Amino acid sequence: MVKESKFSYNSKDEKKYSLGKTFRGDIFNVPETHDMVRSLFDPTVKKSVSDYLIVLSLFINGIVYYYSPVTWRIPVFIVLYSFWRLGYNLGIGILLYKQSKSHSMFHWLKQIQINGGWAKKFVELELSSKLNAQQLNSVPDEFKTWIVFRSLVNLILMNDFTTYMCLVFACSDGAFNQSLSLIFLRWVLGISFFIFNIIVKLNAHLIVKDYAWYWGDFFFRLHNNEELIFDGVFDLAPHPMYSIGYAGYYGCALMTKSYTVLIMSIFGHLLQFLFLNYVETPHIEKIYGDDNLSENTISVNKRDDSVFIGTGGKPLVMLTKNFNWLRTNDIFTVVLALYASIVPIFLPASYNNSIIILAIVVKIGTSFVLNSVLYLQSRFKSWTLSFIKNYGTINISILDNKELLERLSFQNWTLLQNNTLVLNYSMLFTISVREVMYNEKFWQTEWLPLRFILAALMILGQFLTVHQMIDSIGLFGWYYGDFFIGVLSSHKSEVTTLSRSGIYHFLNNPERVTSNLTVWALYLLFNNSNKIFLVIALLFTMNNLIVLNFIEKPHMVKLYGEQNVLKHTSGIEKSINSLFLPNHVQGTIVKLSGSIDKVIQDSSKVIDEFIRNKHNQKPKELSLKKRRNSFQQVIELIRGSTDDTLTINLQELNDQGQLQLLNLLRKDDTDFYNLGDPIKVEWNMEDHKGKDKAWIGLYNIFQTSETRTKTLVSSKGYWIPIHREKYINLSDKIRNEEDCILEDELNRGVVQFSAELLPWVPGTYELRLHANEKHEVLAISKPFDIVVKKIDVPTSDDIGDERLEDFANKLYQGFVSKLFPAVESIEDESNWFLQMHIKENARQVEKLCSTLSQSCGVHLTKKAIVDEKCLKDLSFKISKLRKMLDELML
């Protein structure tokens, strides 16, 4: 982030002055100033006493380096560098902190001018060297304070750099005691880092000029410097002068091959971040506005509050954030982490391979579950629908509040995602600790200290990035909230586009780069001792790519549009293009990236279409289709067969009897009965002799298609004798009732399958006429389907009693009266309760549950049915469910 400046005020161009404004409100022209190097070393620029003292101190550093014993150089310059680095980050930090809070440096200067003495003379001499007489009279004391402060900054920063470079030279003795290839690689990378550092610093100074370089906004404001903007290297990384602006440190460590240089570089860099966090950032927030009070941050916080209100509070993140001792889920997560990361550590070394395999299996399993949930939720709202099935059908009051239902289902998802994430990283911790404890090869690894340092930095990088991501997109974004929740009514004006603040300004998908840093850090640390860490790293990386390209990206395009998702240029991309890449190279990269995106999109569409087709065909429909196709294949094989014996058997079937379906329905060239409707069949036999005890069975055609001359499977009780009097000793009295055998003549008759003689499973069926108490087939009916009749569910907000009763009566006549004849009406509470709770009726209740779910297009549980007082109340619940499902699928 940089301060916008439309005027140049520190270089000789057509506009030498810009307006400044003190915190007291005084307006003044800002005189021209010069950068640090030019102020000290350009002979055309007038020098002050402090400039000569600074140059002298630099020569003293060189003299100390030259004359100090070789064995003393490193410790001497460690001390000197530490002194100047602390002078920078601690000394300047304290001065700026006090200046920000109470303008203390301004008051000190005023006090010096009042008290007089050598300090006043020194300040006047310093100012007269930097400003002419006219400028001295026109600029306010705040600007004069800044000029004096610049001299102190020049002293500290130049000595900080010089002592660091002296330390680098002192530690360079072992820079060339390696193989030529490694030396070449180290120096190429080191020089590249150093040059990159110089480019970043120069570009940063070109943009922010002396005003920001010397913390001018601690002393006064520029009139045209009202807000923070992003430009140049400030698009490349957050706070580039303090982050990537220290790449040269690590380049020097590479060139010298010195752990001392590396550790001191990390030390200096860490102090710089502390300076940024405790000095600069609070002042930036004070002057330019707090990031936490920005429009995006406020919107993100409001959205999180809206989503998690009434659901137990904000969910746990990474074991510590939002932890609540009174929430069982949080305690469970911590116990899970402790159990998975500590208990396995104390198992014998012989368990190493088993634990590693378990970690891989856990990662594959949890990834499959999470990815499947996200994919199906994006396409079909499957997670929310499942939640409605298991919770909404029990608590009907929730069906009046779509937002609450979505929030509750989302809360359950956050628990699943967080626990699986904790479990996976706990397992990684376990196998890493066991590798250190039990694998002797690990301690023989080359460059082990360097590996430890780099691994720690990579893990820290992922940790900090995750926090920045959560700060930018909130818990809602971290947990893929827009997969589960639409725009909240209380939040319609908030966060309706993708967030481009924080880390998302620099990277479109920071998780693509940073979410796998930990596993690759472990690979870097352990790859010499155990190659399985490469498999683990690749597994995590592949899963990340699958989620981003095949699940998250298509969903984001669907919600926010292709232009906003695929065509947006990140800050890093813009900066690299403008600073390092020619136009023709940029064009080639754009084309290549577009080609890769197209391949990914095409692959995603193919997978999406395949799964969508499978999902849209319900299991029952697939089963019916499979069975019907199987039957047709069997018939075609039979008809096309040249087997003489088979032909004779078929002819015998036609001659011995016939079965004619009487009340068959037909639609779209398909013969069918509605589930529960009686099936009437007329039978005929020319030769009745010896067949008095013939019977007709009802079979699923998929089970009987293997043979046409003999039935090899049980009828499962779905059968009727053709003559009532021939089965007088039949224990099953239902088959002796008159509603089963409607007509009974010698050579013909009519029977009816109804009530418990009907299968309550949709499918393709046939009727078979069998010989006396045997399974030899005399005749077979043509195949027909038994289907569930679809009943329109009223879903309007103002559904009245009349429409509700009409709907309930359709359910009663279509299904309930056939399964539970004792229930007399839709408001019969006593018989409904009795029938629903009789143990012997459990199977009938399950049939009703399945049938109503298919007929009404909702997912009902057995508990959802038995908990209602009567059928009318159940109908009202189904109406509410259907309305909720329709709203979710919009």
UniProtKB/Swiss-Prot annotation:
Pathway: Phospholipid metabolism; phosphatidylcholine biosynthesis
Lumenal compartment residues: 1-51, 97-150, 201-227, 280-330, 376-446, 490-531
Record carries keyword tRNA processing: no
Chief location category: endoplasmic reticulum
Transmembrane intervals: 52-72, 76-96, 151-171, 180-200, 228-248, 259-279, 331-351, 355-375, 447-467, 469-489, 532-552
Record key words, sorted: Endoplasmic reticulum, Lipid biosynthesis, Lipid metabolism, Membrane, Methyltransferase, Phospholipid biosynthesis, Phospholipid metabolism, S-adenosyl-L-methionine, Transferase, Transmembrane, Transmembrane helix
Topological type in the membrane: Multi-pass membrane protein
Subcellular localization: Endoplasmic reticulum membrane
Root EC class: transferase
Catalytic activity annotation: a 1,2-diacyl-sn-glycero-3-phosphoethanolamine + S-adenosyl-L-methionine = a 1,2-diacyl-sn-glycero-3-phospho-N-methylethanolamine + S-adenosyl-L-homocysteine + H(+)
Any one Gene Ontology cellular component term annotated for this protein: endoplasmic reticulum membrane
GO-annotated biological processes: methylation; phosphatidylcholine biosynthetic process
Residue intervals annotated with topology Cytoplasmic: 73-75, 172-179, 249-258, 352-354, 468, 553-890
EC number(s) given by UniProt: 2.1.1.17
Pfam family membership, one: PEMT
GO molecular function: phosphatidylethanolamine N-methyltransferase activity
InterPro entries xref list: Phopholipid_MeTrfase, Phosphatid-EA_MeTrfase_fun
Protein origin, superkingdom: Eukaryota
Family recorded in the similarity comment: Belongs to the class VI-like SAM-binding methyltransferase superfamily. CHO2 family.
Function description: Catalyzes the first step of the methylation pathway of phosphatidylcholine biosynthesis, the SAM-dependent methylation of phosphatidylethanolamine (PE) to phosphatidylmonomethylethanolamine (PMME).
Protein name (database record): Phosphatidylethanolamine N-methyltransferase
